[in-house]
Regions:
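Cell-wall glycan-active module
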Residues: 1-9, 15-365
Length: 365
């Protein structure tokens, strides 16, 4: 009996130790909070339909990602959502059907698919009795267009082989987040997935979750939030990397586009930024391979602790005679079939920043 008692006691102690270790290494995330949701509602623009529902989705996203529900974070979310969709979960896009048809034809031409093949595919009858071409004429939202193309690709003959990359909708939801980003960051998604992550992006809850992840789910050293807004549009750390490109240009004497892209992705050939850094390799005491490998880390926070990053600024600051900025607004022209005006990342960031400061209480500004 003593043997079994000692065995039970040891098992109990072991179980308690495991539980305590679990608590120590995995602190509980805060649950959604009515108080936080009340604050979100107060900071949202007046006239938002179902403000309580929006607040609940925002609160859940913040809690699930361990992002503090500060006034600044909430106002950043509000500002981006207001800019991107006006707090409409399924915003209508004027002229979307024509835009989509032009984009489909452009992609077909790029793949050397004859126009008659596209026309024949669009003439195929879809499950609702209409042809895909007829349905395309009626689309009003990106969600409708994305669903149409997913159906189209799966149903028409050779659809996956010919048209697998033809879905023109690569962003969606009320924060217009990249679907590729969402698919790469779905590990802790707190909701049951309705079919696919693409579908979830077009839901209010999913669009807000992934949009908030893209906006606030990474550390930065920025002293002004406008750079985070620019990154939301141009990609994580684009503002930091654009500033580095400016420093590289000063140090090397080679003019560079300040677009935040440090390497030429999808190519073995070095881009302009990498060539400029290579011209400094003796001063940096680095090989071309070391330079390339380091620049490839440019989408990480740790990149700014690299010897390359520090040495470039040492050189550039000395030449400039003053510390150069560590963040600048990227000079990127916005490219999208939906955009009909000459807009830039800087324009986007400034517009969102204006909305942000209107949201922030007067004492905070």
């Amino acid at each position: 009996m003593d043997f079994y008692k000692r065995l039970r006691d040891r098992a109990a102690i072991l179980l308690l130790s495991v539980l305590l270790a679990s608590c120590a290494t995995q602190p509980e995330r805060r649950p959604p909070s009515v108080a936080v949701q009340n604050q979100i509602v107060r900071l949202m623009p007046s006239g938002v339909t179902d403000a309580r529902g929006w607040a609940a989705d925002i609160d859940t996203a913040l809690a699930a990602q361990d992002i503090p529900a500060t006034t600044q974070n909430i106002c950043a979310i509000v500002a981006v959502t207001e800019q991107e969709s006006g707090f409409k979960p399924h915003p209508m896009v004027p002229g979307l059907a024509k835009i989509a048809r032009r984009e489909l034809e452009r992609r077909a031409a790029a793949r050397h698919i004859p126009a008659f093949v596209v026309d024949a595919a669009l003439a195929v009858q879809s499950p609702d009795g209409r042809s895909y071409g007829e349905r395309l004429k009626d689309v009003r939202t990106e969600e409708e267009l994305s669903a149409l193309f997913e159906d189209f690709i799966g149903m028409v003959p050779l659809g996956k082989r010919l048209f697998s990359s033809f879905n023109p909708v690569d962003t969606g939801g009320p924060m217009q987040v990249s679907i590729a980003f969402a698919e790469a960051h779905d590990q802790d998604y707190p909701y049951p997935v309705d079919g696919s992550i693409r579908n979830e992006v077009f839901s209010r809850r999913g669009g807000m979750y992934f949009g908030i992840a893209h906006l606030l789910g990474y550390p930065t050293h920025y002293h002004r939030i406008i750079y985070r807004f620019a990154d939301f549009n141009a990609g994580w750390y684009a503002s930091r990397n654009a500033a580095l490109q400016n420093a590289i240009s000063v140090a090397s004497g080679m003019p560079l586009a300040l677009d935040g892209d440090l390497v030429r992705y999808g190519s073995d050939e070095p881009g302009a930024t990498e060539r400029a850094v290579r011209s400094l390799r003796d001063k940096l005491d680095m090989t071309n391979e070391e330079i390339h490998d380091t620049l490839e880390q440019g989408e990480t926070y740790e990149f700014q602790a690299s010897p390359l990053y520090k040495r470039i600024y040492e050189l550039a600051d000395r030449i400039a005679g003053k510390p150069l900025p560590r963040a600048v607004l990227p000079g990127i022209k916005l490219e999208s079939p939906k955009i009909t005006h000459n807009l830039t990342t800087a324009w986007f960031a400034k517009r969102v920043s204006e909305r942000f400061w209107r949201c922030m209480p007067p004492a905070s500004s």
